[in-house]
Amino acid sequence: MPSVLWILFDGGGDRPTGGKTPFYVAFKPVIDYFTSLGSCGILDPISPGVRPGSDTAHLALFGYDPYRYYTGRGAFEALGAGVDLRPGDVAFRTNLATVDESGVVVDRRAGRYIAPEEARAVERLMASIGEEVGKAYGVEVLYRSTVEHRGVLVLRGPVSHKVSDTDPHKVGERIHMSEPLDGSKEAALTAQVVNEITRRFSAAAEGLEVNKARKASGRPPINAILLRGGGYMPQIEPVKERYKVRAAAIAGVALIRGVARAVGMDVYTAPGLGGTKDDVFDEAVKLAVELMSRYDVVFLHVKGTDSTAHDGDFRGKVSVIERLDKALSPYVDKIAGNYLVVTSDHATPVSIREHTGEPVPFLLYGPDVVTDDVGKFSELTCWRGALGRLRGIDVMPTLSSYLGLAEKFGE
């Protein structure tokens, strides 16, 4: 029985720069070959005009209405970082950041690259802060670094996710104070804990030895921590029960591993797949092809297209696409007897450097899929394809149907 290889370029969608997009410019003979043999369309990850987060977009793409199942980004980050959340736990996504002398955020990612020894130093500092704050407020505080500037903070005890973010979500502003969003004592306590952790981190981080080295080399210091997306673990029907598919996900980013884990996918990583713009895809693609013999759907997440777009790096985004395509080239014959999906979870135009709400290109190839006349995978071409305009939540039912696993609706 055939299976599906699903390649997801995070933030891969774009707007034309000089009349062309990274997908259009990229030399990607394998993807374009299957485009010439498959059906194309454009995809609204959630719905037209909605600017998706990667979390809500992946929920929709995996077949779950984000308006029903989304409970905050933090829970998925924690799951993806290997934290087993308990009922009542509240988790936050964190960014290591840089603020100036007046406390204004000048870099929400502290230069993006955080070396392993720097991440370990931050974890030691956060463990000390967590122990002190935990004793003072009667909660347990867990922190774990994930990829680059990213991390996860988990609060355990009489806490609530009903608090506001400290992350201003843009540079040029001070770190926000967390505020309770309802009148509960749990929300009030949680906001106090979040603000105290934020304050203590900023006070202590300047003294970190790794910051002295960063400053000496001209790199921005890690002197602030930003929290956002407080949430709890939702109750989600596994994808095997809902869509009858055995699914696996390969991802280097904690958030995506967490969403996949939450919907019941088996989660894998591969050498070279660290969730950065410099990822090497050969081992990840090899693993994906091997897993196709054991799973109905194998999902491969490519983060670098989003990271480069957030940095405004057009050529870097093109390079990520081309490197992934090159990694596919040894497996063309293997893929040809199965199904292939290529798409994005949202657009991150290099000219905007943020997620936007336009549709993204979509390809479905398979031995029994109608062939249209598109021939080249890009925003400028896929709109002419046979599939028309789809929603993210349509993808998994469509794949289940092609695999012969979908149940009939009615008689």
From Swiss-Prot:
It is an enzyme of class 5 (isomerase). It catalyses: (2R)-2-phosphoglycerate = (2R)-3-phosphoglycerate. It comes from the Archaea. Pathway: Carbohydrate degradation; glycolysis; pyruvate from D-glyceraldehyde 3-phosphate: step 3/5. One of its GO terms (molecular function) is phosphoglycerate mutase activity. SUPFAM superfamilies: Alkaline phosphatase-like (SSF53649). Pfam families: Metalloenzyme, PhosphMutase. Keywords: Glycolysis, Isomerase. Its EC number is 5.4.2.12. InterPro entries: Alkaline_phosphatase_core_sf, ApgAM_prokaryotes, Metalloenzyme, Pglycerate_mutase_ApgM, Pglycerate_mutase_ApgM_sf. One of its GO terms (biological process) is glycolytic process. Belongs to the BPG-independent phosphoglycerate mutase family. A-PGAM subfamily. Catalyzes the interconversion of 2-phosphoglycerate and 3-phosphoglycerate. This is 2,3-bisphosphoglycerate-independent phosphoglycerate mutase.
